[in-house]
């Protein structure tokens, strides 16, 4: 199954590169999150009634606009296949290179259209506008995108110049009140932020935990485990969106964070008999 998925992306690489050249005039492969077997988004998601002035490379879709990270998950799986199975992945290297190049080229281009500099004051890419999954929209430096780029670049190990310009994962502090004692002052807990900023919430995913899984930046035996656990327990959307139904992966995050009982309960709920 993995090989067929890898080959699917590899087969569509020329289309993804042609999309980028045609719409934006720069290098790199732009894969949309959901696409047809010929490599383009389906017409309904691209948008039948698009404003004339709207960017032709974007889907006119409140959920899917700027959602380009999915290919990076496949790039990482390809790289992990080489590590775990000693597989020859040389044929997929152009896919990995071009997928990474898109983010570097595109966000430099967008920054240069807004102002004189391609990078921020710290020498990092400005990943704006972006999307943290389909949930936090019009993001500046989404944590899911940053974790994806950083992890793939570190595993790939051949693009150190690009790795140096990837911004840090954004963090934030959340006030946590003691429900048993209303007199006690709230405590500030440091958590992973969904992004540096965003304009709206459009779905019910939890991209602030994507640095835990699939990207493994945080976890057992790694630095700042408490920050990731704080995110799981105290981030208001992470708590509100928590579920065992469908594609929800809270059970995986709990396991990666060493929350054994939490993971057990979520797994039991996910594997229980459904209503239909």
Spell out what each predicted region is:
Residues 1, 13-19, 102-113, 136, ...:
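Secretory-pathway/luminal and periplasmic proteins that interact with or process carbohydrate-rich
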Residues 1-15, 26, 62-84, 90, ...:
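Active-site core of glycosidic bond-cleaving carbohydrate-active enzymes
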Residues 27-94, 98, 104-168:
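The feature captures the catalytic groove of carbohydrate-active enzymes
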């Amino acid at each position: 199954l993995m090989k067929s998925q890898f080959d699917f992306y590899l087969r569509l690489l020329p289309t993804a590169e042609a999309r980028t050249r045609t719409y934006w005039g720069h290098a790199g492969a732009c894969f949309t999150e959901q696409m047809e077997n010929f490599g383009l988004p389906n017409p309904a998601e691209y948008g039948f009634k698009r404003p004339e002035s709207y960017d032709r490379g974007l889907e006119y879709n409140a959920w899917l606009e700027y959602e380009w990270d999915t290919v990076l998950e496949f790039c990482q799986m390809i790289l992990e296949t080489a590590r775990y199975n000693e597989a020859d992945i040389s044929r997929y290297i152009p896919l990995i290179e071009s997928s990474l190049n898109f983010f570097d080229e595109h966000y430099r281009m967008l920054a240069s259209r807004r102002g004189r500099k391609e990078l921020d004051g710290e020498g990092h890419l400005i990943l704006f506008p972006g999307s943290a999954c389909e949930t936090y929209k019009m993001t500046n430096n989404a944590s899911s995108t940053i974790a994806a780029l950083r992890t793939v670049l570190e595993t790939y190990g051949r693009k150190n110049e690009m790795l140096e310009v990837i911004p840090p994962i954004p963090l934030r502090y959340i006030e946590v009140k003691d429900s048993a004692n209303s007199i006690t002052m709230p405590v500030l807990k440091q958590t992973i932020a969904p992004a540096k900023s965003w304009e709206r919430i459009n779905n019910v995913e939890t991209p602030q935990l994507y640095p835990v899984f699939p990207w493994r930046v945080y976890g057992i035996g790694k630095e700042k485990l408490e920050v990731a656990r704080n995110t799981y327990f105290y981030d208001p959307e992470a708590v509100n969106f928590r579920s065992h139904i469908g594609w929800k992966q809270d059970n995986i995050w709990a396991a990666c964070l060493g929350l054994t009982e939490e993971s057990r309960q979520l797994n039991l709920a996910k594997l229980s008999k459904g209503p239909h």
